[in-house]
Amino acid sequence: MKTTVTTETITDVKMNIEPEETPTLDDKVTPKGKGKLDMVIAFDTTGSMAAYIDDVRHQVAEMIPRIFKDNEDLRLGIVAFGDYCDMENRDSFGNAYQCIPLTDNENDIIKFVEESKDTSGGDGDEFYELVLKKIIEESPWREDSSKAILLIADADPHEIGYTYRDYVVGNQIDWRIEAKKAADMKIKVDTVSICGRSWCKELSAMTNGISVPFKSSGKTGTMIETATTARSAMAFAESASGCEDASTRAYCRERVHGLKGKLFSMFSDCNDEELNDVCDSYTKEIDKADE
């Protein structure tokens, strides 16, 4: 029996055919193990840093999803810290060291930051030396990941011999030794120096990290997003440089360029000299990693 196809039938068939969509970068699946980044953000919660941390708390709910969208194999850890004087006693840190270990659970990170407690800090110096030691030794770093720490600081670490009550007697932790330990583990320590501390520059130099001066408390969230976006770009650049598969290498380079594009769009209309300096510092490092 012959079937007659009418104009109406053809129209109906055309209407039921879905056009094929060209996959975008966001639709593509990241090749396994490429762009893998473990990054710990550590911020000083003492009184002088209150405005900086408040800015992060206000932005974190919107910022964290954007950061994780940039990299499907990202894990973040957060450390909020004070000083020895903020400990409950010699055996309990209390609010002096608050930590969420490396994780990809966005809700847990947001909740932790929003609920983190402020501290006093007491004297001028803070226990940055202990913070570095604990992050380096206790974080569950993945063996094949790019590793970074972002330390936001406005004071100096305690030197050898420092004593506070019986909480720490004759401090034996040297931040320089901790920096060498980080370098040996290929952990890059980026520092945001609120008061232009020279030790921050030295710490970053020792670990092949980036050190940027920063004064404006209302832009701390933007600075953190810039740093994490850039570190994701560098992780993809590292994956590309060590990859023999041409298609995977091309994908990683495409991700690098996409993340650089995000940074450019973030700062294309920015007239803030301080933020532009942060962006320029990180962009230069991305270019070096992508050579």
Where are these regions (language model features)?
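Divalent cation-coordinating acidic motifs and surrounding scaffolds
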Residues: 2-291
